[in-house]
Amino acid sequence: MNTELDLQIACEFDNLPSEAQFALWADKALSQYRDESELTIVISDEAQSQQLNNDYRGKNKPTNVLSFEFEAPPGIDIPLVGDLVICPAIVLAEAIEQEKSFHDHFAHMVIHGCLHLLGFDHIKSEDAFEMESIEKQLLAELNIADPYRDEI
């Protein structure tokens, strides 16, 4: 693997994926675009997710994943890509609502967040199509079904 992961569990939650699973998912997304990567994933509760979402996005509710891209100062070349903050309570609620496995949806959120750290976005429809296509391809390589199958 070319990705060094710092996994920080900031809340208790049953049935979380293993650190090895998080590392595999992050590496799957990041190694397509970078030779080396360093990433922090924070597993947060709903209160922390809501606070960060409000502070950085102006949305006063918890969310599934927040991406905080690291931008090195000019002349500094380090492999740090940034931080993901993932709220397992939201990921679980979405997985149940969308009739997906918890771990499959978690894999999607890690890959989705990593792609944001690499500069991908889904605000414009053409950008969303590109990002979703990459997500579907990477998830398929992990034997995970198309997460957008119901949106066609």
UniProtKB/Swiss-Prot annotation:
Needed cofactors: Zn(2+)
Organism: Pseudoalteromonas translucida (strain TAC 125)
Pfam family membership, one: YbeY
Keyword list, A-Z: Cytoplasm, Endonuclease, Hydrolase, Metal-binding, Nuclease, Ribosome biogenesis, rRNA processing, Zinc
Protein name: Endoribonuclease YbeY
Record bears the keyword Cytoplasm: yes
Molecular function terms from GO: metalloendopeptidase activity; RNA endonuclease activity; zinc ion binding
The family this protein is said to belong to: Belongs to the endoribonuclease YbeY family.
Co-factor binding details: Binds 1 zinc ion.
GO biological process, one term: rRNA processing
Assigned GO CC terms: cytoplasm
Residues reported to bind Zn(2+): H112, H116, H122
